[in-house]
Amino acid sequence: MMLPALLVLVLITVLPFIMLIAMSFAKVRLLGGVSLSMNGFGNWSDVLTDPATWHSWGVTLLFFVLAVGMEMIVGTVLALILNSMRRGQSLAFSLVLLPMFLAPITVGLLGNFLLDPTIGLYSWVMESLHLVGAHQSVFGSQTTAMLAVTTLDMWEWAPLVALIVLAGLTSVSPSVLEAASVDGAGYLRTLFSIVIPSILPVLLVALLVRSMDAVRYYDIVHITTGGGPANTTWVISLQLNEKVQATAVDGITTLIGQSAVIGITMLVFTIIIANVFVRVLDRRGLMK
Amino acid sequence: MDKTQTDTGMARRTVLSAGLGAGLGLAALGLAGCTPSAKTSGSGSGWKQFSGTTINFISENTAPSAAIAANSKPFEDLTGIKVNITQMALENLVQKVKLDMSGGTSQYHVVYADPYQVLAPLSQGLTDLNQFVNDKKYPPVEKGLADFIALDAAGRFESKSKLYALPYDCPTMIWMFRQDLFDKYKSKMQADLGFDPTPSGKITWEQYYQIADWFNKNAKADVPYGTGHQAKQHDSLQCDFSNVLWAYGADYFDVPDIGTVGSQNPGKSTLTTPQALDAAKFYDKLLKVAHPSSTTWDWDGLGNAFAAGQVAMCPNWHEYAATNEKSLPGKVGYSILPTGPKRSANNWGGTGIGINANAKGNEQGAAWLFVNWATSPATQVMTLKSAKGGGTPTRTSVYDMAEVKKAEKRPSDMPNMLTASAVLEAWKPENIGLRPKVATWNQLDTIVYTNLSKMIAGSQDPTTTMQAMASQFDKVNG
């Protein structure tokens, strides 16, 4: 009964994963069909001693903290606002969710358009508010480029956090909130003493989902900054892609083996992050 | 590199043929003898032999491909072959072609073979077109291979014995400037700067800098900045910088013919020569007076900014002339790029189209018919006229056509031809700029534009930048 499903699973996940591991220990040639010639730990040592790869990991971690942090805060605030609305909640909810349904590449293109210093609406607003100089692009400055791509990611994915948190908020017992109100607890006291603790498992799930995704961030940064300026937004996915595109001096051997190593390290990082969150949930008895 | 044409007809052609023959090593001249002279595409036999076949053509999203995609019906009527055209950014194309060639099958039968990012690293995945050129069962290449401009640079790698692609487009970097603003301010600028600022090959890069700076300080009412550059951390940054590098007498490698047929053994880089360091220092200085958004523009971004009146001048690919004429009709002039201590260098960005070696049977034949048709003079004239943006013909004969010559002056129904005199000058051997055709170019390209991006962002000084590039080049090339 389960066999067909297992076979499909093997085909689409296990075999490619095994291939990925094999490639990480091999020189990969593509022309005329994929062929591997074992290379020991050559790819691993090349990647692990490559300053560019470590730099891109640093950039990724910065993005990770900024993006996930902003998404959690903004998403939670959005959910609280939506939850408190008595009228028009459905309409507002639909509008808030819209960015989430856009392809990331579209978000990047939108960002390029809206933040274009010549024709971009957001650029015009920021220039009017003296937040940026005349004709300055936020994507062109080392100090603002990361913030810009992070904000675009937040714009797209904070709604997902809002959706998850909103689901959690509906589970907060009205009688408990009523009791807090009767006891004279203010909004902030109620929020931090009752609401947040009640939805903590949901918040951690949202954090887990977004964290796993943030490591793979690629589309928006690719289309907006290309990793620049001066490599300030060169995330690990761009580094991986760079290796995929590269060819060795013989014109035949690719550097896909090195990109496989980077892919595996990304996977390991994601697993570690996921495990940390799961342990936190488990320690607090929230996994049940 | 590529192109042709002029006011003096034969004289221009003679100059170009001689120039390309000598400077670009056009093996085409030698091959011409074994190429059957052809009639017109569409005439003769052999076009219908693969009727009913469907082929796929993958191309960068360039003006010629947009024009052909919008008007491929003549090919389908002529051959009965259905052609699907997919267009995308070059970096995505490279990835798709590489994966396609690795599969043993061919999803894409006709491939836009960028000489640096596709042809050099993947030449072994492309079919040698000589088998079709010399096979009588196929319609001959109209006017022969000798009619092509830059056949070696666009179509060969390492050896002149094999031909992997036929030249398909040939954008070249030239100096685009607001003629109306130069006319308006010429006398004042000349008085202030002490030289005639009229754009031409006589203007030095240092003077270009001074002109840009002058616009910044004296013409804000008309244009925000004097110069703009495609200085995003992207392939475009390397293209823009290369013009200056060559103008200063430096190069990436010191290997003969590395820009035409290429090499798999480029050896040590030459990016730390005094000339290279001077070029980097100047480029760093130039970018300091450029439009601040230059660091976010690739060629498209720069083209749009110029068309939007953001800069008075810029170096960009000549195929943007069509866009300029729509946005700034009659207001844009064209010249070869300024000269450096050594020469004027104008980056050639031409590309050929080739056939995936994995294509089977009828697909190969049908693909060849498409390659032959798409690069034929008649098709190139069609793309020149296209409202989709205009082509950049790769046939000498096209530039000699009366209607094409007429289009060199306004009003022109082939706006790209307004750049003809500049481009013709740019293609002369002494002015052409050819990037090194090596298998590792994708890696080297990234090294160049990443380090340059650090330099113009102020994170690295020019000397450190060039030293970093050189050491990384040498590491990649062993």
Per-region residue spans from a language model:
Chain B
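N-terminal secretory signal peptides
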Residues: M1-A11, A22-L29, W373
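C-terminal capping/gating helix-and-loop segments adjacent to ligand/active sites or protein-protein/ligand interfaces
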Residues: C34, S294, S412-Q472
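Hinge/lid segment of periplasmic solute-binding proteins
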Residues: G42-W47, P115-I174, D240, G333-S335, ...
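Extracytoplasmic/periplasmic substrate-recognition and gating elements
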Residues: N56, K73, S102, S161, ...
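Short, polar/charged alpha-helical segment
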Residues: T62-K82, D180, V448
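Extracytoplasmic "Venus flytrap"/periplasmic binding protein-like
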Residues: K73-I149, A165, K184-K186, Q190, ...
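Glycine-centered hinge/linker elements that transmit conformational signals in sensory
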Residues: Q207-N216, V244, Y248-T296
